């Protein structure tokens, strides 16, 4: 499903003043990665390859499901090794601030 997760991320997006970042989620079993760009109050999200990424994250669909269902944070997924990431870790930590799925 090409729309998986997109509406959920949109619904939970909390704009961050003066914050810009580009994320690429490689979700196991999906042909295309999930690209997410935050530009202050604007969120761009779609499936497809993009350049100039700040944080690459790799995870299984079950882990992404746990995150968007509010059972786990991005930070916890990373700390437990259920999500691997490379790039700017300060930008990685912002994910839980911008997308509070746990409330």
Question: Which residues does each predicted region cover?
Answer:
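Feature captures hydrophobic
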Residues: 1-103
